[in-house]
Amino acid sequence: MRPLWRVSAIVLVLGIAGSVLAFQGGSFGVQGPGSFFSQGYSDDDSPSSKEPSEFYWSRLRYTSSTDLYSGYGGYGYGGSWRRDYPKADRQFLMALKRLTRIEARPTEQVVDLDSDDIFNYPWVYAVQVANWTFTDAEAKRLHDYLLKGGFLMVDDFHGTADWDRFMAGMRMVIPDRPVEDLKDQDEIFHVLYDIGARFQVPGEQYVYSGRTYEKDGYVPKWRVIRDDKGRIIVAICHNMHLGDAWEWADDPRYPEPFASMAFRVGLDYIMYGMTH
């Protein structure tokens, strides 16, 4: 644990570290996995889920090659789309409320590709995207969503095989746009926080093994796909697991620098998506 004077300095310089420490100290009211349902609310029936807001954290629900059940996996435990859900989403939303002036709904919104409802949400987050599969209609709807102003952030897939499977799905959606490696000076890293040197953000395996990578994903890849005008439409977080960092931010065993980096990146990506 950092000495208090060092913690105070980090809070003054970054702001975000204070949020991570608040998570770990319990001042956000987060007690651990499953605590969001301690009041008897299900995923989407809490009173706050009906509040009108200017921003909705939207998580993409998709069919996947590893679903335990048919279709979208429902709201049970099936479906790769729901990794870290909903705790990661809601802890990130608490940080968004604390650190920005965005009026965000405190609960997440699940969006599907089998309806046009996705067009109501300008920013969408997806995980475990090595496992996603699309019908032709779903791929076209996501294609249209991105080219009409939508922003997609993908996270939590690792290594060469995962990359190839992710790109197989992505090429159904955006077949003709190149994937680019982000540079330090790219605008998306300087919208809210100036993020210079970046490092690999590990998942929960770090707590148990000290290992930052999964599979053969040794080097973090910060990549994007842009539209014809240069706007980023897909932000790709490969060989890292930001969602786990958000989910584990309240656990003192998970190092603060990893959680702080994950929050800063997510906040910059949201601010970019909302302003471009």
Predicted feature residues:
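A generic secondary-structure signal for well-formed alpha-helical elements
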Residues: 100, 150, 170-177, 273
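Surface-exposed patches in mature extracellular/periplasmic domains of secreted proteins
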Residues: 102-112, 154-159, 177-185
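Short alpha-beta junction capping motif
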Residues: 57, 118, 123-163
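An acidic, glycine-rich "communication" segment
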Residues: 27, 32, 37, 65-71, ...
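Bacterial N-terminal signal peptides
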Residues: 8-19
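Aromatic-Pro/Gly-enriched surface loop or interdomain linker
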Residues: 21-123, 129-130, 241-244, 248-276
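Positively charged n-region of N-terminal signal peptides that target proteins for export
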Residues: 1-6
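Extracytoplasmic/secreted envelope proteins and their assembly/folding machinery
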Residues: 89-93, 139, 143, 163-167, ...
